[in-house]
Amino acid sequence: MNKLVEDCMRLGFGMMRLPRIEGTNDIDLEHTKRMVDAFIEAGGKYFDTAFIYEGSEEATKATLCDRYPRESYYLADKLNASDFAAKNEKEAKNEINISLERTRAGYLDFYLLHGIDEGNHDKFDSYGIWDYMKQLKSEGVIRHYGFSFHSTPEHLEQLLTDHPDVEFVQLQINYADWEDTLICSRRCYEIATRHGKPVIVMEPVKGGKLANPPQAVKDILQRANPDASFASWAVRYAASLPWKQM
């Protein structure tokens, strides 16, 4: 595998489900600052946000970009071409400008076509987003581009065949979904590796569900190591994959 970064630990920080101020929907920035600081102090560098994560890019600016030297972290952001995010090509291609304004990051280390599935694939094609990604990279606005994926293994095979210049793929991978017949984590992972693409993992703890798995699963994990948290088992599983970048 051609690693995208060499000086980064295998755990990233998702700026999606951030703590909220009690009784409101406002992100608790002070709490988030402490989380960001703890992550960086532990050796973390990779942060992930998205255009459609409400308040996330602004929180990334306040808790990360305004407080740390730009070269000290990697930032991933995402372009969403679905109808609720962009009504036309112009709006889709302008998302990068809004994201850079919100984060004040200057540039993006990783830029993803967000959540490709069979329902929005045609928008990325008709808006010329694939070539737009190459343009942004040539201009130095982004360093690497890829896509996050929520569809079938056959669809992933088609995308990677049609777009061999894509540098990485972000997949939902965890031990609960590895053999799931809808998410098909294993099959998608194997397709990505066969195409030589580094894999960035999302949902390693399945939105927190694997931090509190069914009792039968708890019993197995506690017998194996009573001192390990359930969440740590989930993270270790995802981190053990050899083609996993993050």
Annotate each PLM feature.
Residues 1-73, 132, 138:
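N-terminal binding-site loop/beta-alpha segment at the start of enzyme catalytic domains
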Residues 5-11, 43-46, 69-73, 105-109, ...:
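Short, well-ordered coil/turn segments that N-cap beta-strands
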Residues 13, 39, 47, 60, ...:
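Conserved, mostly hydrophobic/aromatic
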Residues 14, 50-53, 111-114, 148, ...:
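Conserved residues at the C-terminal ends of beta-strands
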Residues 16-30, 78-91, 119-122, 216-228:
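Active-site mouth loops of central-metabolism enzymes
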Residues 56-66, 88-100, 104, 121-131, ...:
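Distinct, well-ordered alpha-helical segments
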Residues 71-84, 111-116:
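A short, structured active-site edge motif that brings together acidic residues
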Residues 116-246:
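Beta/alpha (TIM)-barrel catalytic core signal, keyed to glycine-rich beta->alpha loops juxtaposed to Asp/Glu
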